[in-house]
Amino acid sequence: MNMMRTAMLLAFMTALFMGVGFLIGGKGGMMIALLIAAGMNLFSYWNSDKMVLSAYRAREIDEANAPEFFHMIRDLSQNAGLPMPKVYIYDSPQPNAFATGRNPENAAVAASTGLLERLTPEEVAGVMAHELAHVQNRDTLTMTITATLAGAISMLGNFAFFFGGNRENNNNPLGFIGVLVAMIVAPLAAMLVQMAISRTREYSADRRGAEICGNPLWLASALQKISGMAQQIHNDDAERNPATAHMFIINPLSGERMDNLFSTHPNTENRVAALHAMAQEFSPRASTPPPSGDRPVRKSGSVPTTGWRRGNENERKGPWS
């Protein structure tokens, strides 16, 4: 299903590229756009994860320089039955996180310094388990390719005027009106694609993430905190790269106050409600209290060690059980 969804996404993005090319330069422009789209699809498959990590200036960490956070990811990955992903931290006061990579064998998870400093260990575990769920569900390929191509399509639409705005351009079958259509429709269509693939996968990743970390209430508490802080703390890199907004656990853009229909993410209250309902199904872990909101904020960028008990390997354990 995920491979089919990815193929349909690539086909739509390619068709959109060709359509904009046709509006700008007729059949010749359409063929050039097809070649560009094919090249970008191939490039995105192999390199889009590197581009996203580079855009946020994320730095890879290991057991030596961030042992506690690294160990937590290792334990959560083992609980999910996943290979150990590469682990990154990027500098941003806004608490948030994302996952990227073309498959579980070539995956990476990234957390902001704000996430590690402002959330409790249990909440961090819930967030990173959510990101690992995206890796396990193979959402990361779709997310990274969408971010790359949506940004390129928006750029092509924004520059359509300069490439095809000449009223005397005989290669443009629809003239100046066609260019205006390309400028408006292309970025909008790219945004709609991002919304379409984002909504249901977030609920699925929430549920699987709660299973991985062992307690839905940890993730629910994290979502509430991140959602509130995202409106108050700007993420400058995300503002410069809005096409990547759908990759984060909570939309990082400061202007995200749209309703459910036009949001890149499901409504946070709905996600939290679903997790609380899920907590009632969890046994015996449903009685585990949510993380304390009055715990002092940590000054370092590390997360306390998981303390995962190994006594019974068949029993699912959360990293702070």
Curated annotation (Swiss-Prot):
GO terms for molecular function: metalloendopeptidase activity; zinc ion binding. Binds 1 zinc ion per subunit. Its main location: membrane. Keywords: Cell inner membrane, Cell membrane, Hydrolase, Membrane, Metal-binding, Metalloprotease, Protease, Transmembrane, Transmembrane helix, Zinc. It is a multi-pass membrane protein. Gene3D superfamilies: Metalloproteases ('zincins'), catalytic domain. This is Protease HtpX homolog. It is found in: Cell inner membrane. GO terms for cellular component: plasma membrane. NCBIfam families: PRK01345.1 (NF002363), PRK03001.1 (NF002826). One of its GO terms (biological process) is proteolysis. The lineage of its organism: Bacteria, Pseudomonadati, Pseudomonadota, Alphaproteobacteria, Hyphomicrobiales. Its cofactor is Zn(2+). Residues 281-321 are annotated as: Disordered. InterPro entries: HtpX_protease, Pept_M48_protease_HtpX, Peptidase_M48. The keyword Mitochondrion does not apply.
